[in-house]
Every structure is written in structure tokens, then in C-alpha cells.
Amino acid sequence: MHPSRLRSSAARAVVRAAIVLILSHGASLALAQRAPVSPDHPWHGLGEARIEADARNFTEPGLSFDREKAYSLPELIDLAESHNPETRVAWEHARTQAAAWGVARSELYPTVAAAALAGVDRGQVYLADRFFRQTIGDFEVVLNLNYTIFDFGARAGRISAAKAEALAANFAFNDTHRSVIYRTEQAYYQLLNASGQEEAARANLSNAQAVQQAAEERLSHGLATLPDLLEARSAAAQAEYELQAVLGAEEIAHGNLANALGTIPQTAIRVQPLRELTIPGTIDDTVNSAMDRALAQRPDLLQRVADVQAAKARVKEARAAYYPSLNFTASPTVQSLYGLQQQFPWGQTAGLAGGMAFKLNWTVFDGKARKNRLAQAEAIVHEAEAQIRVSRDQIANEVWAAYSDLNTALRQREAATALLEAAGRSYDAALESYNYGLRNLLDVTAAQRTLAQARSTDVLARTQVLTTLAALAFRAGDSIQSNAMKPRP
């Protein structure tokens, strides 16, 4: 075969391969972007693997904890504020709004743009009875300056609105920290309650096993019946069942705390135990004082106030549309030209050119668009102001409920302490009487169940005081303030 034909065949093969590759790639993209073919089973497409790989790339390494250290609540809160992704989201949003304010403020300054142009044109020109080759070169530096001299407040309205929106984003950032702190406190106290319930459940199991052992000994001496022993075994099995339930709740509490800290649930975290904490008996605060603080410092309420300021600034911007705006434009140009024509010497010239203009813009008629935009902006202001009143009522009610819950928890703590002491004495007396044959086994198991419930109630009451105290600080907005402003128990 002729070499040219071989080259032609090879070229056609390459073209066919390229066409097949393009068509297959296009088909794969079409399949990847196609909707599920039917509603009766899940979709699995070609793009699923790539998305799954991208999803794995967003995984961050978990926090590392010292296994020998018991972390206190302030240390856990510091870790949560540093590593919980919610604070990062709120922070980036605040930075975005701050940048938007900077963009709005840039309207106070002129806009200056520079451009450099260079070109060469070569061709033939006809002069007299012949053509001559001609070369013309051009080099220009152009500055374009634009500035709004006045617009009757439209620019100022946009700047004020952007500033208020940046302020609202900062308050939202603070509110995110308030929520993260409260979630960490809740998870910590939930874990303390679960750990305390585990201790109580193990003590209950130990008591039930002691009762079972006493029943077995009495049965071996003919002083008890088989039903008594079966009742004791049933109580021990019930105590074991309750212990396993408590262990499961403790695992969940560990996961909740890890989630609040911004790490994976299986992270091992040792925390300061409940017995090392001081449980307050009273609180040196009044509900009126807590309400006043909440209405003055709650970041979500302050965010609402900033929203009102932004809405009012938008009204100012909307009103400015009824008035003219004056713009100034200048475009100085430095130009350099040179030329060469056949049989003639080079020619060159340079100079300053350009222009300037004032432009007055005034919308005379727009089909009531300005009127409706102004009405819309004013309605947004009224809505935002009404939302503040709604938020104030909600905050006052939240503080009232949190304060009431705290007082209730303090009273229940006193009752739980007395209940535990009485139940412990009752159980000891019942078991001793049973060993002497003065009480039956039903009395002992009943006392044992009462003691178990009293232990559980005591743990719950102690952690409930701490939880409700944290809730009051959360509702009043004290958790993100300086320590000097927080209520002291």
C-alpha cells in the first residue's frame, strides 16, 4: 500500500477513536446527570463514587484526649468552642458580612481603572498610481475614573444596612457560642447523671445479691422457703437488667458529649466526676434581675435589634430613588503613534487626550416601582420591630421557666437527700430483721427497691440542680459574658 494511503488510514483511525472517546465521555456525563429511572428502588449512578470520595475528604481528625486526665467543665467548654464546626460556620458567616460592609463602604471612593493598549497595523495604501506598504503602531494608556458625587442617601443607606447586617452576624456568632456552651454543659451533666446512675445500679445489684445470699443461707438452714429464694433471685436479675440499661445510657451520653465537642462519638473522654463538684443549695439571684440581664444581653435579641437597623437603612436607600444622582466620569489617555510608509522616513507623535463628563440621573417614571419598593422596605421594618416584641416575650418566659425549674431542683435535691438517708436506714433495718427471722423476704426486697430508687433519685436531683443552673445562665445570656456578670449560686 502506498505510504500516503497508510497515513490517511491511520489518521482516520485516530479521528474515529477520538469521536468514540468524546461520545462515550458525553454519554457517561449524561448517565451521571440522569434522574432515577423509577421510584421503587434507590439510585446508584456513575457520579456516586466521586461524590462519596469527596465526602470522605471532608472528614477531620478527631480530638486527642489525655486518658489519664479527668477534664473539667471549663476545659470541655474551651474545647467545644475551639473545635465544634458550628462555631466555624458562624465565624465564616460573620467574616462574610464584614467583607460585605467593606464592599459597601468602597462606594465612598472613586473607581479608577487603567488599561494599556498596543497594536500594529500593516497594509497597503494606494497613492497616485501605485501601492505603498504602510505600518502604523499605536500605544495607549487609558485611565477611567468614576465617582458618585451625591445620590441623596442611597449610598449611605446601603453602607448603614451592610454595617447593621455585619453587626447582626456578629451577634449570631455569639449566639452560636452560647448554644455550643449550653450543649456542652447539658452533655456533661447528662454523662455525670449516667455515671452516677451506674454507681447506684451497681450498689443496687450488690444489695440484691446480698439479699439473695441471705435467702440461700436461710433456705439451707430450713428457715426460708423456695419462693423466698426465687423472689430474691428475681430481684437480683432485675437489678442486673437495670444496670445494663444504665450502661447503655452512659455510652450514649459519652457520644453526645463527643458530638458537642466536635469530635467522633467513639472518642474516649474522662471527665471530672459528680462527687468532686460543689452542688449549690441556693442561688443568690432574683428572677427580675435575670430577666433584666437577658433583655439587655441575649445575643439573639441583639441580633433582632440589628436587623431593625438594617431594615431602616434599606428604607433610606429606597427613599433616595425618588431623587437624582450625580456622577462624574473622567478618562485621560496618554497616546503614542508612529508610522512608516514605503520610501518615507519614520513618523512619531505622542500626546495627552481624553475627556470628562458629569452625568445626572433622575428616574421620572417607573410604573410605581419606587413606591412599592419603599412600601416593602417599610413593611420589613415593621415586621422586624414586631419580631423584637415577640422575642422579648419569649425570652422573659424562658427565664421565668428556667428560674422556676432551678428553684424546684433545689427543693427536690433536699427531698432526695432525706429520701436516700431514710431508705438506707430502712433497708439496713429490714435486712437485719430478716436475718433474725423477724421480717419476711418481701419486706426486704421492697426496702431494697426503695433504696435503689432513692439512689437513682439522689443522683438525678444533684445533676438536675447543675443542669437547671446552666439553663438559667443560657436563658439569661450569662454564659458568654465575663465571669463578673454571671449569677453566683
What are these regions (language model features)?
Residues I77, V142-N144, Y188, M291, ...:
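Membrane-embedded beta-strand positions in outer-membrane beta-barrel channels/transporters
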Residues N57-K69, G102, A115-Y147, P273-D284, ...:
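Small/polar, glycine/serine/threonine/aspartate-rich low-complexity segments that form flexible
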Residues M1-L79, L247-R293, A473-P489:
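Terminal intrinsically disordered/low-complexity segments used for targeting and assembly
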Residues L219-L223, Y434-L438, R475:
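A short glycine-centered flexible hinge/capping loop motif at secondary-structure junctions
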Residues F171, D175-R293, D405, A409-Q412, ...:
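Periplasmic alpha-helical coiled-coil/stalk elements that build and connect Gram-negative outer-membrane
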Residues L76-E81, A224, D228-A232, T263-Q335, ...:
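Amphipathic alpha-helical coiled-coil scaffold segments and their short linker/junction regions
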Residues T96, D138-E140, Q186, E231-S234, ...:
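Transmembrane beta-barrel architecture of outer-membrane proteins
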Residues R88-E92, R105-S106, T135, I149-H177, ...:
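Sec/SRP-type N-terminal targeting helices
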